């Protein structure tokens, strides 16, 4: 993991140079929407949490419209452990029974979301938290998980959903009023149930519906890695399919990369997987030309 930069040790001249280099990117993304999937260590380490909050505020101040979709897997696991439940995953998706869904709603829509909103507001931003149930934002349907061992069969993983439709009106209204939306990935179904939706999938769909200029997905690794542990900086759809096929991309990276690729194919101009363990990784990706993480291309 990269060591954090001590900004107090940077000379005024170098700080000015850094800002000058960011200017073309500020112009490029001014007035544009950037969807950020926020998760991993960046949500649990205090230094990284504060750095992320400041990054998001800076983006808003220079005229870029950040929309945050957050995860909270470790926090959910911790809450489940307190009530004696063990988290179970199939193909990177959390098996969610009724009791687990109650915990998910409490943790994501309450504890985690409010922590993010409070931190952004503490540093001078104006963040508003909402779940996919608020304002009819995310219509969900039950996810039918294909059984890899039995083609044509499906595995029931409970109240786990996929995005059926997104109504972006509430997000656009918040953006128009200069707020930063912070979204918990919980949707509502026509059956009246709440659904736990993978945050990567929500971020990808939301980026598409909002016509976002960029989708940034934060993770706990440098990006997509090959089997030897080398960073793959640029991946096409064909290359990604091959990595799925040979098992290089597996587990929790499956929904992340699938969502990133779908967003790229649906017209999101720039899609990147970045290392959230590096301080200011969001700014490095958006406001510099330094190659960072893995770029996902549709062709």
Curated annotation (Swiss-Prot):
Substrate binds at residues 72-73, 94, 196. One of its GO terms (biological process) is L-arginine biosynthetic process. Keywords: Amino-acid biosynthesis, Arginine biosynthesis, ATP-binding, Cytoplasm, Kinase, Nucleotide-binding, Transferase. GO terms for molecular function: acetylglutamate kinase activity; ATP binding. It is an enzyme of class 2 (transferase). InterPro entries: AceGlu_kinase-like_sf, AcgluKinase_fam, ArgB, Asp/Glu/Uridylate_kinase, NAGK-C. It is found in: Cytoplasm. Pathway: Amino-acid biosynthesis; L-arginine biosynthesis; N(2)-acetyl-L-ornithine from L-glutamate: step 2/4. Gene3D superfamilies: Acetylglutamate kinase-like (3.40.1160.10). Its main location: cytoplasm. The record marks 37, 256 as: Transition state stabilizer. Its EC number is 2.7.2.8. It comes from the Bacteria. One of its GO terms (cellular component) is cytoplasm. It catalyses: N-acetyl-L-glutamate + ATP = N-acetyl-L-glutamyl 5-phosphate + ADP. Pfam families: AA_kinase. HAMAP family: ArgB (MF_00082). Catalyzes the ATP-dependent phosphorylation of N-acetyl-L-glutamate. Belongs to the acetylglutamate kinase family. ArgB subfamily. This is Acetylglutamate kinase.
């Amino acid at each position: 993991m990269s060591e954090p930069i001590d900004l107090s040790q940077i000379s005024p001249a170098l700080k000015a140079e850094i800002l000058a280099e960011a200017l073309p990117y500020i112009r490029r993304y001014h007035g544009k929407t950037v969807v950020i999937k926020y998760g991993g260590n960046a949500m649990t380490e205090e230094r990284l949490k504060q750095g992320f909050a400041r990054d998001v505020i800076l983006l808003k101040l220079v005229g870029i419209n950040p929309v945050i979709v957050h995860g909270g897997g470790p926090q959910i696991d911790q809450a489940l452990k307190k009530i004696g439940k063990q988290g179970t995953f199939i193909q990177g998706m959390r098996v969610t029974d009724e009791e687990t869904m109650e915990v998910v709603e409490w943790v994501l829509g309450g504890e985690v979301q409010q922590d993010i909103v409070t931190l952004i507001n503490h540093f001078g931003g104006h963040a508003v938290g909402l779940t996919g149930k608020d304002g009819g934002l995310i219509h969900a349907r039950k996810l039918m998980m294909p059984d890899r061992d039995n083609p044509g069969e499906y595995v029931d993983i409970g109240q786990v959903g996929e995005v059926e439709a997104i109504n972006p009106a509430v997000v656009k209204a918040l953006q128009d009023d200069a707020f930063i939306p912070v979204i918990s990935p919980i949707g509502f179904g026509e059956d009246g149930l709440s659904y736990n939706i993978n945050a990567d999938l929500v971020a990808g769909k939301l980026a598409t519906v909002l016509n976002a200029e960029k989708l940034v997905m934060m993770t706990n690794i440098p990006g997509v890695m090959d089997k030897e542990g080398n960073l793959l900086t640029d991946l096409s759809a064909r290359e990604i399919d091959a990595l799925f096929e040979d098992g290089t991309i597996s587990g929790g990276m499956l929904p992340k990369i699938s969502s990133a690729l779908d967003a790229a194919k649906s017209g999101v101009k720039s899609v990147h997987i970045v290392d959230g363990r590096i301080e200011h990784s969001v700014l490095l990706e958006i406001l510099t030309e330094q190659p960072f993480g893995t770029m996902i291309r549709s062709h």
